[in-house]
A protein has these predicted regions:
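Short hydrophobic beta-strand element within catalytic cores of glycosyltransferases
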Residues: 309, 314, 318-321, 331
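Conserved donor-binding/catalytic core segment of Leloir-type glycosyltransferases
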Residues: 204-233, 245
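Nucleotide-activated donor-binding/catalytic signature segment of Leloir-type glycosyltransferases, i.e.
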Residues: 257-278
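Conserved acidic donor-binding segment of nucleotide-sugar-dependent glycosyltransferases
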Residues: 330-334, 338-345, 354-360
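N-terminal subdomain of nucleotide-sugar transferases
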Residues: 1-62, 108, 162, 194, ...
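Carbohydrate-associated surface elements
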Residues: 173, 195
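A short, well-ordered alpha-helix in the C-terminal region of glycosyltransferases
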Residues: 268, 347, 354, 361-375, ...
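Acidic donor-binding loop of glycosyltransferase active sites
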Residues: 285-300, 317
Length: 424
């Protein structure tokens, strides 16, 4: 019997390694969650071989709908989902309802009563339908734009929060933001930091005589790479010697390359493209300073708790970032790194220059950051906090009672096995 189910839109995902680490650690701590992914991974990287055997994948969308429609035609669905299909099938995001109807008997087969989703998006809305049609309880972890930006879908963010047993956020900033907008959720929103495996980030050994600035993230507005490049232009004008490597990929790549060329920074600022997690670690270990100039984007979204800042701290790299969302909960200005206001590249350049010119200060801040990361962000500690919430606030089987479950897909239609239980 599984203690609960993790429900993901797409798992594993190389750009969401913190989710993989949490799921793996939850299993190590004895909770025996059932891992369910609604879609197959596009970019699992080196994670796939480590955990893919543990993941149960839903069929492709058309096949899943066909299976549900066949069960309805044969009158093998409980009354509530049977009636819901014609009412909602043409609505936007109706696939979430079909996923819930298809998934419900699979969950019952494994004794699962509670579902935890990551992100207030596709998986959380499927979990909402599981509750609405079948009475399963759910919780979810909200991360950044999924909670900060409203959706125009039938299942709104407000409905997700109202229906959840509890909601997890990465930061106190996000917790207070949600409680202000959803007063009914006060007392049900909890802060649990994302976790990292500290042993995967050995202390750094900066490489090369030329100081190296490293930044990592998708090439999107909220990462502030345009401001970082502008800060690098200021550094060049001040005669500071450096190399800046920006690791990632995304829709702004062409614009960023144009900005680098226009500023004649091609010899010192490099867009190095996407890299594997192991390669990112090597770049961090060789860095003199890590920089992430986060900004709010035009839709009001922003980073909340950038995992890569945790990883830089764990490596002992001094950090320069901005005062936005939960970043000040990671970095206290002048203690673990330097913070500036968003969209002030000249001030960002000042902080970078101080790091690059005063190696004693940089080394001290790097050591402080590593100690802070050990205390706040170890995956063992953060997963234990989520496990406590699941046991205390949801119908979840505690670790001592969890048993290994048969993860094979049932050969007999699971709808037939539990139909009577849900006839109303």
């Amino acid at each position: 019997m599984n203690s609960f189910a993790y429900l993901f839109e797409r798992f594993p995902s190389f750009v969401q390694t913190f989710v993989y680490r949490e799921a793996a650690e939850m299993m190590r701590q004895g909770m025996n969650p059932w891992l369910v992914s609604l879609r197959r991974p596009e970019d699992p990287g080196e994670l796939a071989e480590q955990i893919s055997a543990e993941v149960f994948y839903a069929p492709e969308e058309k096949e899943l709908r066909a299976q549900v429609d066949a069960e309805r035609a044969a009158r093998r669905l409980p009354r509530k989902p049977h009636r819901a299909i014609p009412r909602h099938r043409s609505q936007p995001d109706a696939q979430r309802m079909f996923e819930a109807i298809w998934l419900a008997p699979q969950l019952r087969e494994r004794g699962v009563r509670h579902v935890h989703a990551h992100f207030g998006g596709v998986a959380a809305r499927t979990a909402w339908w599981l509750q609405e049609l079948f009475g399963f309880s759910y919780s979810f972890t909200g991360h950044a734009n999924d909670i900060f930006c409203a959706t125009e879908l039938p299942v709104s963010n407000e409905m997700l929060v109202r229906g959840a047993k509890f909601v997890v956020t990465e930061t106190d900033f996000a917790r207070l933001w949600m409680e202000e907008r959803y007063p009914h959720a006060v007392g049900r929103v909890f802060r649990v930091f994302n976790g990292i495996a500290m042993d995967g980030f050995p202390p750094r050994e900066p490489a090369g005589a030329v100081p190296r600035i490293v930044s990592v993230g998708r090439y999107v507005e909220k990462k502030g790479f345009s401001d970082l490049i502008e800060a690098c232009r200021f550094l060049r004008l001040r005669g500071v010697e450096f190399i800046c490597e920006i690791i990632g990929g995304g829709p702004l790549e062409s614009a960023l390359r144009g900005q680098i060329a226009a500023a004649e920074l091609g010899d010192c600022v490099q867009l190095v493209g996407p890299r594997s997690q192991a390669e990112v670690r090597r770049h961090l270990a060789a860095a003199h300073v890590f920089a992430l100039a986060c900004v709010p984007d035009q839709d009001g979204g922003s980073d909340n708790l950038p995992t890569v800042i945790m990883e830089a701290m764990a490596t002992g790299v001094p950090v320069v970032s901005t005062r936005i969302a939960g970043v000040p909960e990671m970095i206290t200005d002048g203690v673990e790194g330097f913070l500036t206001e968003p969209r002030h590249p000249a001030a960002f350049a000042d902080a970078l220059e101080r790091m690059l010119r005063d190696t004693a200060v940089a080394e001290h801040l790097g050591r402080q950051g590593r100690e802070s990361a050990l205390g706040k962000f170890s995956v063992e500690k953060t997963t234990r906090a989520l496990k406590h919430l699941l046991v205390q606030h949801a119908p979840v089987i505690p670790p001592t009672a969890a048993r290994a479950a048969d993860r094979e897909i049932p050969t007999v239609s699971p709808w037939t096995r539990w139909l009577r239980r849900f006839r109303r």
